[in-house]
Amino acid sequence: MIWDNVAKIYDAATNVTNGKANRKVSEIVAKQIESTDNVLECACGTGLLTHRIYPLCQSIVATDFSTAMLLQTKTKCSQATNLRLDKADITQLPYDTNSFDKVIAGNVLHLLPDSKKAMEEMRRVCRVGGEIIIPTYVKPEHKNLLTRSWLNLLRIVGVKFKNSFTFSTYQEFFSTLGYKEVRYLLVDGCPSCAIAFVKI
């Protein structure tokens, strides 16, 4: 699995290419977390968001499909006492319906062959009145040289995009699925990151 192979260098590589944007996204997501929240994070990767969230919430379950990525999260969040790490598939979440106040999935929808199924699962486990927060890398409406270079580098190392969103098509994705209460925010970077805040 590509993510097992790149887990140890992922933070260093993304910090060089998009560190400022990633930190900004983490700050924005963290502001949505309340002290009483039970949080599920899908596709936690190396724990960039997890590390910001766990001190703020009541509990957090962080999941990923890559064992190596989970090990990176475990190391990064070694002081957490309210964190559980699970290996899990975002399209087949092993949790009861209405289990979490906040469900977060950062930079994964564009990598999935079935993003709709992932949304269905996140919706299922999120409590009524809760929120799904989904930061996702988006390409510019018109590609620039820097973005093309970044995308080519990802292809070289084996990362395959199953869905390629722009900011406008990202909004269309949620509209097509029938979500009405969605707020969007675009964080500039290379690539930029669109954050969808989906009220349940």
Regions found by a protein language model. Give the residues of each.
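Conserved class I S-adenosyl-L-methionine
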Residues: 1-34, 48, 72, 76, ...
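C-terminal alpha-helical "lid/dimerization" subdomain adjacent to the S-adenosyl-L-methionine
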Residues: 13-16, 133-188, 192-193
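A short acidic, Gly/Pro-enriched loop at the edge of an enzyme's catalytic core
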Residues: 91-103
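C-terminal lobe and adjacent flexible extensions of AdoMet/dcAdoMet transferase-like proteins
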Residues: 195-200
